Amino acid sequence: MRTSIHAQTIYVFAFLLGFCSIVYELLLGQSLSAFLGNTVLRFSVTIGLYMLSMGIGALLAEGRWLEHAAATLLKVEILLTVVGGFSVIFLLIMNSVGIPDTLFSVLAHLLIVLIGVLTGLEIPLLIELRGHEVEGCERTVLGVDYLGAFCGTIAFAFVFYPRFGLIPTTFFVGLLNAFVGVCLYTQRFKVHEAGRRNYAALVGVQAFFFVVLAVLVQTANRVNELFLRYSLAS
């Protein structure tokens, strides 16, 4: 029974992480389109870089990365929570201070690559936690992750962007990402004795960002108004 629950939890994680990652990329694509124009170019390059970076991340997932899969995945989720959850705010600040368009574009595309690489690491780590010996593990985790990504694109197009806008959506998806990170601790994955203290510290960091983003979600409209006022004033 425990094995079954554990398996279902891994699949839920895969779905949610696939959902979060694609929404991060769509947020960045839309932000680039809004700031620099040429929507087709921005989204094409964003998705292309995202897929390439995912492949790089998957290739990096070997050796010591997989040896301590639970701790490594938690580190990945912390990074994704921070990079993805604050990506739009970062771009808004960079645009507000008036940096050149070329530098702005480089910074935005670095975010795209970083999120893609981290996303590419997630699947091998989830498969490692699920266990290679389980028949059909790899294809099920992949399938559920892709389903999550599909649902993310639909949610972004029909719910998040038209109803809430970029900033509230970024905070919410970052919060969802942080929630998955915190939930990793509740599953009691096998952690090496020497790494337990470090693992507990990582959970604390993830919990901190969860609280921060929960507050930001509640105040997202106010934050949005502040940025609009600043943009109009400048």
Give, region by region, the residue ranges found by the protein language model.
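Alpha-helical transmembrane segments of multi-pass membrane proteins
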Residues: 1-234
